[in-house]
């Protein structure tokens, strides 16, 4: 999801614990046993980072995936399962950033969506604000990459190889990691490959209408706004910062529990989400994601992604599909990092993007119809302005931004799986 698009939406509407390790049967298409799917903490003191690990525990390669703006590890579960099921030598780790710990999931105990809806829609949960969490003002790209390096180092344990990838601004984050200077060590030296899914740097989102040129003056103004209390990105705000994520979680749970039952949630939604007439629980998701999506970023093409898959993805809470709170400082820093070079603005913000031209690991880029060709064009620019000697590009213009992650039959696998297989030890 993109910042500028989400701002238009905002104008229109005015701590997680680790789960036990699960050794289960592999999904259809998998060629190996045992199959591990676990959500666990990698530490980090008061603000731990969590990962969803999917695939063979003995795999010698790990693909670390980062979600985009407002995206969480649960949004990557479907893709992680599909990849790990086809690649016996690769385990997939989907990252949950530290801000996911801020969500109050206590109202989701049990499987009663009516009870959960009554609690959350009445505001009977712990809502986080700038006053209660002022420390989030400092959670920018440096913090995100420090946390991500903890994940990468854990993935590298025992001599495993690590490929780093991401979706949307998660792809931007992956490239920033590769170019980052970690106390004299370039980030790309931790990696054996990069995977960019419908995102990146250097005008990757220009085809959608998003071009980022943050001047030093704009950066100073952004920092001042954060210091004045705009700690959380307001792009998805519907009354409260977290309301949109909560509503999607509830809609998913209703659709999983009783897809054909009349939706009691629909009439309680804010106007931009409310369908024009009565719908079923599954019909509410179709209205939101197919018939009348808020923005192109938040849509699916039913030729690729079924409403049942949308429901299952949204219904999960730990990990969930959406972050409840996105740090405004991270929005500012990722926007400023888009030129993928050291600038006066990156210096002002303390962004250590010192090694973009030295990156030398294989790169994969996939684009959907969202960016009208600019995602792959931007990836080609990165390759042309670095030491990358091997790159693969693919795309499907009929797919949406979310289809790349949630598709039941994902065309991206035809080229991403061979790319990752070539990198396996």
Give the location of each predicted region.
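Short, surface-exposed "cap/lid" segments of acyl-processing enzymes
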Residues: 56-110
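Gly/Ala-rich beta-loop-alpha elbow adjacent to hydrolase catalytic centers
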Residues: 166-170, 174
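Alpha/beta-hydrolase
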Residues: 205-361, 369-370
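Conserved loop-alpha-helix segment in the C-terminal half of the alpha/beta-hydrolase fold
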Residues: 365-393
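Catalytic active-site module of serine/aspartate enzymes centered on a nucleophile-bearing elbow/loop
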Residues: 388-425
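Alpha/beta-hydrolase active-site loop
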Residues: 113-155
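N-terminal export signals
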Residues: 5-25
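N-terminal cap/lid segment of alpha/beta-hydrolase-fold proteins
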Residues: 31-50, 54
């Amino acid at each position: 999801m993109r910042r500028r698009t989400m701002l238009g939406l905002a104008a229109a509407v005015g701590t997680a614990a680790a789960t036990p390790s699960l050794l289960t049967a592999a999904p259809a298409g998998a060629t190996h046993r045992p199959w591990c799917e676990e959500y666990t903490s990698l530490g980090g003191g008061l603000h731990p980072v969590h990962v969803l690990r999917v695939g063979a525990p003995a795999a010698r390669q790990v693909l670390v995936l980062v979600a985009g703006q407002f995206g969480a590890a649960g949004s990557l579960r479907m893709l992680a399962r599909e990849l790990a099921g086809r690649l016996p030598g690769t385990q997939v780790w989907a990252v949950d950033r530290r801000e996911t710990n801020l969500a109050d999931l206590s109202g989701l105990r049990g499987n009663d969506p009516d009870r959960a809806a009554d609690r959350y829609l009445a505001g009977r949960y712990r809502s986080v604000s700038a006053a209660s969490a002022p420390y989030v003002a400092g959670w920018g790209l440096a913090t995100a990459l420090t946390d991500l390096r903890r994940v990468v180092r854990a993935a590298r344990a025992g001599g495993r190889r690590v490929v780093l990838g991401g979706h949307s601004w998660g792809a931007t984050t992956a490239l920033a990691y590769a170019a980052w200077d970690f106390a004299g060590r370039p980030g790309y030296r931790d990696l054996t490959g990069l995977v960019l899914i419908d995102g990146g740097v250097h005008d990757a989102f220009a085809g959608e209408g998003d071009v980022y040129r943050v001047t030093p003056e704009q950066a100073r103004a952004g920092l001042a706004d954060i210091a004045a209390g705009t700690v959380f990105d307001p792009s998805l705000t519907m009354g409260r910062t977290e309301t949109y994520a909560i509503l999607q979680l509830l809609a998913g749970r209703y659709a999983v529990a009783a897809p054909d039952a009349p939706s009691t949630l629909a009439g309680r939604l804010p106007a931009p989400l409310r369908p024009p007439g009565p719908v079923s629980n599954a019909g509410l998701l179709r209205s939101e994601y197919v018939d009348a999506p808020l923005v192109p970023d938040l849509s699916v093409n039913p030729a690729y992604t079924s409403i049942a898959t949308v429901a299952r993805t949204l219904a999960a809470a730990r990990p969930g599909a959406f972050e409840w709170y996105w740090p405004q400082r991270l929005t500012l820093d990722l926007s400023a990092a888009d030129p993928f070079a050291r600038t006066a603005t990156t210096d002002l913000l303390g962004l250590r993007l010192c090694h973009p031209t030295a990156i030398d690991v294989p790169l994969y880029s996939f684009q959907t119809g969202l960016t009208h060709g600019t995602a792959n064009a931007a990836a080609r620019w990165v390759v042309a302005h670095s030491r990358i000697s091997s790159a693969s590009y693919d795309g499907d213009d009929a797919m949406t931004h979310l289809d790349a992650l949630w598709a039941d039959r994902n065309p991206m696998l035809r080229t991403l799986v061979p790319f990752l297989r070539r990198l396996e030890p």
